[in-house]
């Protein structure tokens, strides 16, 4: 009986985390912007992009630039 309560409690916690929208699903198929930038050959920089590179997107939830 305790096992069923423990499983129900765990399920409720899991669903409440998913409903809050705190990027819980990032590891379940959605790729972060940092991963996509590096995978496409770019660099994530907080400062301006170096000469001869262009901004291709953002990194770290829009806090940095993806330079390529």
From Swiss-Prot:
One of its GO terms (molecular function) is CCR6 chemokine receptor binding. GO terms for biological process: calcium-mediated signaling; defense response to Gram-negative bacterium; defense response to Gram-positive bacterium; innate immune response; innate immune response in mucosa; positive regulation of flagellated sperm motility involved in capacitation; response to bacterium. SUPFAM superfamilies: Defensin-like (SSF57392). Its main location: secreted. Disulfide bonds join 37-66, 44-59, 49-67. Residues 1-21 form the signal peptide. Pfam families: Defensin_beta. It is found in: Secreted; Membrane. It comes from the Eukaryota. Residues 22-32 form a propeptide. Transmembrane segments: none annotated. Keywords: Antibiotic, Antimicrobial, Defensin, Disulfide bond, Membrane, Secreted, Signal. Gene3D superfamilies: Antimicrobial Peptide, Beta-defensin 2, Chain A. GO terms for cellular component: extracellular space; membrane; microvesicle; sperm midpiece. Belongs to the beta-defensin family. PANTHER family: BETA-DEFENSIN 1, BETA-DEFENSIN-RELATED. Has bactericidal activity. May act as a ligand for C-C chemokine receptor CCR6. Positively regulates the sperm motility and bactericidal activity in a CCR6-dependent manner. Binds to CCR6 and triggers Ca2+ mobilization in the sperm which is important for its motility. Monomer. Homodimer. This is Beta-defensin 1.
